[in-house]
């Protein structure tokens, strides 16, 4: 087997395959004859300074449903350094578990190719990043002040969308 890739992803049975870039990347890797392994962030860990994971060899096929697209073998222990490329593809929210995963990935730096740099994932907030492109965003306010939110809502003339800076809102 040629190139060995580890995809750190959401549970495979929850991927929306149509338009999912992680799935497209896995399909292309499979088409090239490369080895695909998958794991979730809770499968990452450290042994001393060595980043490790429990990952499943994964056969990827073109399909419309995850049950048809993925065939996985049982999880087995691996060092991240044993993979040629490690792709952090876990969707936000950026929560404590996500942050811990990026800290673990830092221990693989220089030992394998990390796609989606862990430092960059931590530093670029998913909700604030879009504000670098004001011509593409609706009027926006970032605040912890309820009074400012009410004032902004009045200025906008009604309903607004409110999101937490980190994680997901619990409704």
Model segments located where?
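Active-site nucleotide/adenylate-binding loops and adjacent lid/helix of ATP-dependent enzymes
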Residues: 2-31, 36-170
């Amino acid at each position: 087997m040629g190139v060995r890739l580890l995809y750190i992803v959401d549970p495979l049975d929850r991927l929306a395959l149509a338009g999912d870039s992680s799935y497209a990347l896995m399909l292309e890797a499979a088409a090239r004859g490369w080895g695909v392994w998958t794991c979730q962030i809770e499968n990452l860990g450290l042994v001393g300074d060595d980043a490790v994971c429990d990952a499943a060899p994964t056969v990827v096929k073109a399909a419309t449903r995850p049950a048809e697209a993925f065939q996985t073998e049982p999880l087995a222990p691996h060092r991240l350094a044993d993979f040629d490329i490690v792709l952090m593809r876990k969707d936000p929210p950026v929560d404590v578990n996500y942050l811990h995963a990026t800290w673990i990935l830092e221990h693989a730096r220089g030992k394998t190719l990390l796609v989606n740099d862990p430092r960059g994932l931590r530093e670029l907030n998913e909700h604030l990043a879009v504000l670098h492109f004001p011509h593409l965003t609706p009027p926006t306010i970032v605040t912890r002040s309820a009074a400012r939110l009410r004032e902004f809502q009045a200025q906008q003339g009604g309903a607004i969308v409110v999101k937490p800076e980190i994680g997901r809102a619990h409704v």
